[in-house]
Swiss-Prot record:
This is Abaecin. InterPro entries: Abaecin_antimicrobial_peptide. Keywords: Antibiotic, Antimicrobial, Immunity, Innate immunity, Secreted. Residues 1-39 are annotated as: Disordered. It comes from the Eukaryota. Antibacterial peptide against Gram-positive and Gram-negative bacteria. The keyword rRNA-binding does not apply.
Amino acid sequence: FVPYNPPRPGQSKPFPSFPGHGPFNPKIQWPYPLPNPGH
């Protein structure tokens, strides 16, 4: 299960985040085969 942050202004899609680690950065790591919302 991956919690999601609500979309922020200027951000069309929510980014997954992990507790204690802040926003997940798909440009650094994308551990599962899903479309990359950062692109």
